[in-house]
Structure formats: structure tokens, C-alpha cells
């Protein structure tokens, strides 16, 4: 059963400006090491970083309490992006039988993330 839906759209140039202005400090504050490594392996890291920022915001719209930037991040499962969580969020997701589906997309100027939070039977899916 779908419990929540979150979507967010981020302007790629805004992320580029933010990082050019605040550099390494902003990268460390906003993104998990796994996200930074993935993005920096690309010729242009900004669309990937913008999509990951959108994913964090989209998940926050599904979650009932505030989160820090690094409590949720995007990792890869093969070629598919997947949300990863800090231990306290992971534990609560498991306790409540929740699973987060993630879809990312980006075009020339914007990155989009959609998160669907699904309640599953405890133990599977």
C-alpha cells in the first residue's frame, strides 16, 4: 500500500553555483561520500548531484519528521539508484514495514526525483 509520495525538482545551475561558492564544505555537508564519489566519476557531476539533492527533498516530503542531509542518500544497486538510510531511519523503516521506491531524471536545466513510500508486509514484499 502506498503510504506517501514525494517529488522535488532542482535547478542544476543552482547546485553548480552553490558548490562553486562553498566548495568542499558544501559537498561534505549535503552529500554522503557514496554520492560524491558517484557524481565526481562523471564528466559533469552537477546533474547527478542535483538529482541526489532532489531525492533527499522528495524523501523528506514522505517522512513525518525532520532529517539531516546525510541521513538519507542515493546509492546504486547495479545501474539503478536506490535510497540508503542512516541506522535510525533504516530501523524505523524496517519496524514499520516501509520500503522507499526512487526514480531520478535530469534534463539540461533540471533534475527530478520521485519517492514512493510503500508499506509492505513485515518480512518481504
UniProtKB/Swiss-Prot annotation:
Annotated Mg(2+) binding lies at: 8, 57
Question: What is its subcellular localisation?
Answer: Cytoplasm
Citing just one GO molecular function, the answer is: magnesium ion binding
Q: Which Pfam families match?
A: ACPS
Listed under catalytic activity are: apo-[ACP] + CoA = holo-[ACP] + adenosine 3',5'-bisphosphate + H(+)
**Its GO biological process terms?**
fatty acid biosynthetic process
Keywords assigned by UniProt, alphabetized: Cytoplasm, Fatty acid biosynthesis, Fatty acid metabolism, Lipid biosynthesis, Lipid metabolism, Magnesium, Metal-binding, Transferase
* E.C. number(s) listed in UniProt: 2.7.8.7
Which cofactors does the annotated protein need, by name?
A: Mg(2+)
According to its UniProt record, where is this protein mainly located? cytoplasm
| Signal sequence, start to end | none
Q: Which domain of life is it from?
A: Bacteria
> What's an example GO cellular component term for this entry?
cytoplasm
- Cross-referenced InterPro entries: 4-PPantetheinyl_Trfase_dom, 4-PPantetheinyl_Trfase_dom_sf, ACPS, Ppantetheine-prot_Trfase_dom
Q: What is the recorded function of this protein according to its Swiss-Prot or TrEMBL entry?
A: Transfers the 4'-phosphopantetheine moiety from coenzyme A to a Ser of acyl-carrier-protein.
Question: What family does this chain come from, according to its entry?
Answer: Belongs to the P-Pant transferase superfamily. AcpS family.
Q: What is this protein called?
A: Holo-[acyl-carrier-protein] synthase
This protein's species is: Thermus thermophilus (strain ATCC 27634 / DSM 579 / HB8)
Q: What is the lineage of its organism?
A: Bacteria, Thermotogati, Deinococcota, Deinococci, Thermales
Amino acid at each position: 500500500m502506498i503510504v506517501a509520495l514525494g517529488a522535488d525538482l532542482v535547478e542544476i545551475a543552482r547546485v553548480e553555483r552553490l558548490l562553486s561558492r562553498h566548495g568542499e564544505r558544501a559537498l561534505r555537508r549535503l552529500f554522503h561520500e557514496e554520492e560524491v564519489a558517484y557524481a565526481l566519476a562523471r564528466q559533469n557531476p552537477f546533474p547527478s548531484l542535483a538529482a541526489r539533492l532532489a531525492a533527499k527533498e522528495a524523501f523528506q516530503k514522505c517522512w513525518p519528521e525532520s532529517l539531516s542531509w546525510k541521513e538519507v542518500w542515493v546509492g546504486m544497486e547495479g545501474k539503478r539508484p536506490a535510497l540508503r538510510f542512516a541506522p535510525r531511519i533504516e530501523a524505523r523503516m524496517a519496524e514499520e514495514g516501509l520500503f522507499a521506491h526512487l526514480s531520478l531524471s535530469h534534463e539540461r536545466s533540471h533534475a527530478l526525483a520521485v519517492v514512493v513510500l510503500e508499506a509492505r508486509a513485515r518480512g518481504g514484499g
